Amino acid sequence: IELGDVIYNELTVYPVYLHNTDRVNMVTFNVIGNHDHDQTTLLKDSLGTMHYEMHLGPTCYSANIGRVHYIFIDDILYDRKDAKESYRHGLYDETVHWLIEDLKYVPKDKIIMICAHAQMFNKKTTMVRRNKNFAAYSKALLDFKYVYSWAGHNHHTYLYTSEPERNYDIDNLTSITVTKSTGALRLNRLLNNDGTPQGYFVVDVDGEEVSWYYLCCGKDRNYQMKVYPPARTGGEYVMANIWAHDNKWGAVEWWENGVKVGQMEAHDALDPDYVDLYATVTNKTTRIPMLAEEFLRAGIDFDF
């Protein structure tokens, strides 16, 4: 599943993208991103998706695979007021209508995987309730057995399972936001600006059981975090950047040689490796280091 921004504003390279995905030798499901739109047309947004539709098909479609109903949907809304890249997130009225009609044919005991470019539910920094038609599309998904909301767009990795204190009208929801597979924007080297390495999520669906792990390019699946010693974190903490950390994990412990050393606590931090990488970059059009929520830390009372 490709979560959007496949061409980065270059409408003529759709054939190149198709050639490269064909080499992967597997079925590819595409989602349209803001950089896949024709941003030059000022007439109406439907014309902005014309090139995408010519090469990759509809911007909204669905498929049943096993016990899961997959939805691929366009949630990038351009205002078309001027030639600037001005858009918001959410669903047009006609898109909500399509979603409701699509779900009429899906049994309520199905698992739903809804894939969009921008996160439709739990975001890291903004209120998704401001998304156009948020209440309507939330209600449409409310009664299904479980909903997984997949997205890209925000250039960080972020997983969140709904909790009562952050009520988004759906309590059977996990949101997964995926960073760029190629690394930080316009840099395309090793790391993203939250410290997540180049890579992608591998999702295993066994009936109704859904699990996943992050697969870093050039590594095996056991490489799931980077641990930084106190010398890299200011001298007081051991800190771990865990790419696929989820709030539903509960307590995370630090063990060495079969002995529990300490309890890890959630901590927003800059990734030390990306900070070092960014310091060497002369083209500062890439992303600056960002505070990432997937970090955990534990204090120390001995020399490391």
What feature does the model see in each segment?
Residues 1-15:
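N-terminal active-site segment of His-dependent metallophosphoesterases
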Residues 3-4, 103-125:
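Short acidic, glycine-rich surface-loop motifs adjacent to enzyme active sites
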Residues 4-5, 33-34, 117, 151-153:
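Active-site glycine-centered loops adjacent to acidic/histidine catalytic or metal-binding residues
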Residues 11-106, 129-148, 156-204, 210:
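Extended active-site neighborhood of metal-dependent phosphoesterases/phosphodiesterases
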Residues 75, 115-120, 153-154, 215-216:
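Short, well-ordered beta-to-alpha junction loops that form the rim of enzyme active sites
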Residues 164-257, 297-304:
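Binuclear metal-dependent phosphoesterase catalytic core
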Residues 250-277:
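Extended low-complexity, serine/threonine- and proline-enriched intrinsically disordered segments
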Residues 271-303:
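Aromatic sugar-binding surface patches on proteins
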